[in-house]
Regions:
Chain A
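Exposed aromatic-hydrophobic patches
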Residues: 58, 102-107
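Transition segment at domain starts
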Residues: 22-60
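Noncatalytic modules at the cell exterior or secretory-pathway interfaces
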Residues: 65-67, 105-125
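Short proline/glycine-enriched turn/loop motifs at strand-loop junctions of beta-rich domains
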Residues: 74-79, 122-123
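Short, surface-exposed beta-strand/strand-loop-strand elements in extracellular ectodomains
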Residues: 77-93
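Activation corresponds to long, low-complexity, non-globular regions
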Residues: 19-32, 142-150
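Edge beta-strands of jelly-roll/beta-sandwich modules across compartments, strongly enriched
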Residues: 121-141
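Sec-dependent bacterial lipoprotein signal peptides
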Residues: 1-19
Length: 150, 489
């Protein structure tokens, strides 16, 4: 006789646990978001992400036609997307925020570039740096350079 | 074998031979002797009484549940701890918090590269499977261990979100590779042997199946002289090694800028008799085929690994073995510059083995295929982490016909089709049709030459992007050696 009640209670508990942290959050003070922009690099950090869905953009002056992205993010749940546009608005890179990875952008027009981050139910840490690359640098975008995450 | 740019003719070169060939294993296991006693039973292996009075403690192995559990845990803790200690990997720093997140947050398809997801994960699953299989459990009782091992790793072994592709590849691929490795390592072992031969056999078996090697050392079985269990030996066994040249091209005539030349080395093992063993225990009959290739680009040296093991069969009509309704479990890994395809699946349908009194024997099969998970190279999906393929389920089928002239040669033709609606990756669908014809001729039963001509058409439909159709071809020319000699009787 107690089985239906126990089952209902179990479902209630499971639902409560499953929905316990379904609140969609935007970036806030708890994420300690920092952007350090300089002539020779840009670094970005936002930590303690817990179910963050948000979109942030900023500008950075790139004196070279390309850049290298040093990924150091760790987002085990959800996604972070990095979109970089050159001085005329052309997309030169669009990539997920990755864990321990180096990639390079396509060539674009030097000048004021825009960096856009899109978070989708992201948990963990967003962290990367951008370094200008001259046009004649040897491209490194190959699977040999990619590191498996596990 | 569900897909192509493989060597289906080579793969089937011996498919029908088991109904013709009896292969003596007397040099491997003295207590097993096969003989052909009459024309009617010429193809049936017969087991003589063992001529050894050695005890056989491994004939009826005891189950060791807690040892198996401990090994399953070790197979998770060791790689986790290794990554944590050697590279301070954040993904390995599991905690109650990460377990809670993995239990409550959504699963995500992961973006590992092709080899990692389609080979390494199934291999790890094979070790989970063998934690049970080498502790006394049979095939069916070992199969859930691949699932449990994979599930616990996804939930508790790493911080990353659990991935459905990992669970499916590790579980199903682990079962297929696991049973294959268990049986191949059994074939390598010989409990009656001594000295250098014994060491070589034990080391080889340990390399093929590390969990088994560990257990044999711990239990003292690695040096204990006893009888080799009869079920460690198939009714027939056949191996072949091919070496040669192949040329790919994304054209119908092997020309054009995309043409690529490779040197390849492939090996095949055909274990058991498709005619007589399909209806016995799972994988009493299986085929495994692997190939290494030069000049294979980012795909790496391993260009092909295909396993097909019999799960069950039912005779059709009164003639035992000649007409059967068969069910197979399959593992597919093909990675070359033209195509990447990996899948875990099942295939089933009628299989005919016809042995006329004169002329070649005939093998015909028509199998439907269902793949719970299939990975296929995408034209648009590419992540920085290295994933360049789409995931979906695979549905299709195919047929093949093979003519075998005993001791002389084989000629065959195959056609396969698979449809893969994309579940994860770039939205769309993939369809692949492959055909191949080929043959091989042996002289003196052991050395041979072969050739195959393969055609591939693929239709890749992408929502919102330009569709991509392919028309590719492949030619293989090779030398072959058969072990034991092909057509031996």
């Amino acid at each position: 006789m107690m089985r239906p009640r126990a089952l209902a209670l179990g479902i209630l508990v499971a639902t409560a646990v499953g929905c316990a942290d379904s609140v969609i959050r935007e970036l806030g003070p708890g994420n300690a978001e920092t952007v350090v922009s300089g002539a020779d690099s840009l670094t970005y950090l936002a930590s303690n992400l817990e179910n963050v869905s948000d979109r942030v953009s900023f500008e950075w002056t790139n004196s070279e036609p390309r850049l290298q992205v040093n990924h150091q993010s760790f987002i085990p749940h959800g996604y972070g997307l990095l979109v970089i546009r050159d001085a005329v608005g052309a997309v030169v890179d669009s990539t997920l925020l990755e864990y321990q990875l180096e990639t390079e952008s396509r060539a674009g027009v030097p000048g004021v570039w825009s960096v856009t981050l899109i978070y989708a139910a992201a948990w963990g840490r967003a962290q990367f740096s951008l370094v200008p690359l001259p046009a004649d640098a040897v491209p490194e975008v190959s699977t040999d350079k990619r590191r498996a995450r596990r | 074998m569900p897909l192509v740019l493989v060597s289906p003719v080579a793969a089937q070169a011996q498919r029908a031979t088991d109904s013709l060939v009896t292969i003596g294993l007397t040099t491997e296991a003295p207590h097993l002797r096969f003989s052909a006693s009459s024309p009617a039973t010429a193809a049936m292996p017969h087991f003589d009484e063992p001529d050894s009075l050695l005890p056989c403690p491994q004939c009826y192995p005891k189950t060791h549940f807690w040892v198996a559990v401990a090994e399953l845990v070790a197979l998770q803790v060791i790689p986790n701890a290794f990554s944590r200690i050697t590279s301070d990997a954040e993904w390995a720093k599991v905690s109650l918090n990460s377990w809670g997140n993995n239990l409550t947050l959504p699963w995500q398809w992961d973006n590992n590269n092709f080899k990692n997801n389609q080979f390494s994960h199934p291999y790890h699953g094979a070790m989970y499977f063998n934690a049970a299989r080498t502790n006394g459990y049979n095939f069916w009782k070992s199969a859930p261990w691949s699932f449990v091992g994979s599930l616990t790793w996804e939930l508790f072994g790493e911080v990353w979100a659990p991935a459905p592709n990992d669970l499916l590849n590790t579980t199903l691929g682990g079962i297929t590779l696991g049973e294959m490795l268990y049986r191949v390592s059994s074939l390598t072992l010989k409990n009656e042997s001594h000295g250098f031969e014994r060491v070589a056999r034990e080391v080889t078996a340990g390399l093929l199946n590390p969990v088994r090697g560990f257990n044999r050392v711990v239990r003292g079985e690695a040096w204990e002289v006893s009888r080799t269990p009869p079920d460690w030996r198939p009714s027939t066994v056949f191996g072949s090694v091919d070496a040669g040249y192949r040329r790919f091209s994304e054209s119908s005539n092997l020309s054009g800028a995309s043409a690529l030349d490779q040197v390849f080395l492939s090996a095949e093992l055909r274990y058991g008799s498709e005619t007589f063993d399909l209806g016995k225990r799972p994988f009493s009959f299986f085929q495994v085929q692997g190939a290494l290739a030069s000049n294979n680009g980012n795909a790496g040296r391993l260009t092909e690994l295909m396993v097909r093991g019999g799960l069950a069969a039912k005779p059709l009509g009164g003639d035992s073995g000649q007409r059967q309704l068969a069910l197979f479990m399959t593992y597919s890994y093909i990675n070359n510059p033209v195509i990447a395809f990996g899948a875990q699946g099942f295939s089933g349908g009628p299989v005919w083995n016809i042995q006329p009194s004169h002329g070649p024997s005939i093998h015909v099969e028509a199998l439907g295929t269902a793949m719970p998970i299939a990975a296929i190279r995408s034209d648009y999906y590419l992540t920085a982490e290295g994933r360049d393929y789409d995931y979906g389920i695979g549905l299709g089928g195919g047929g093949s016909a093979l003519l075998v002239w005993k001791g002389t040669g084989v000629f065959g033709a195959t056609a396969r089709y698979v449809f893969v609606p994309v579940i994860s990756g770039f939205p769309g669908t993939h369809q692949i049709l492959t055909t191949n014809v080929g043959g091989r001729v042996y002289w003196k039963g052991r050395l041979g030459i072969g050739a195959e001509w393969v055609r591939l058409w693929s239709w890749n439909i992408y929502y919102g992007r330009t569709n991509v159709n392919r028309n590719a071809s492949e030619l293989r020319l090779y030398l072959s050696t058969a072990v034991p000699r092909w057509g031996a009787s």
